[in-house]
Amino acid sequence: MNNIIETNKLCKTFSNGGVQVHVLKNIDLEIREGDFTIIMGASGAGKSTLLYALSGMDKPTLGEVKFAGVDITKMNTDELALFRRDNCGFVFQQVYLVDSMSVLDNVLAAGLLTNKDKKAVTEKAKEILASVDITKELWDKFPTQISGGEAQRVGIARALINSPKLVFADEPTGALNSHTGKDVLDALTKFNEAGQSIVMVTHDITSARRGNRILYVKDGEIAGECDLGQYVAGDQDRHRRLKDFLGEMGW
């Protein structure tokens, strides 16, 4: 299996009142194509900072991030924006849809950024919306007329409309109840099973069980890694192995 991301001595430092805070410390890691990679860790450990560095949303202070063989740390702001548009999909805890546009048009607008064939993009948008259980009856509604879980699934459809090499998800179920959160996780899992590479930050063990590879961040470093790929999804041994691993990490 090929690596879609490789980092070398990745560091991120912030200045806080004149004091240098080292949030990421010499991180070397690989993200494999087709994996559902989970990033876990305590609050403030550097999980989201790592996600943003991997995706090019935030430049590291030092080190390399090679995305599909290209070192994105050497790109300027405009180059990074185009690279993210063409290669990345993003799903955040708070989904931002355009309230003045219909559900379908929110997804369509993202697709038209890279493909000007409106008819083809419209058909693809409808297919993806249907695949995340956003039914035809909702396509003409506005974001204010749908539930939080439905809005998050629209966000997933929007993230996938341009067939990204990698989807980055930052606490996508954090603002949802367990039922609607499960629907969102089901949607992400469905696309991963079809071959979509995903990296997701979460603090929730139920969400983490969806991944086949767990990276645990502690004090800005990768403290440990757990491979769940050998276990069947939903199997108690999978859950037990994850709990044991998190216990070893002091979670």
Model-flagged regions — what are they?
Residues 221-246:
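Conserved beta-strand-loop-alpha-helix hinge in the C-terminal portion
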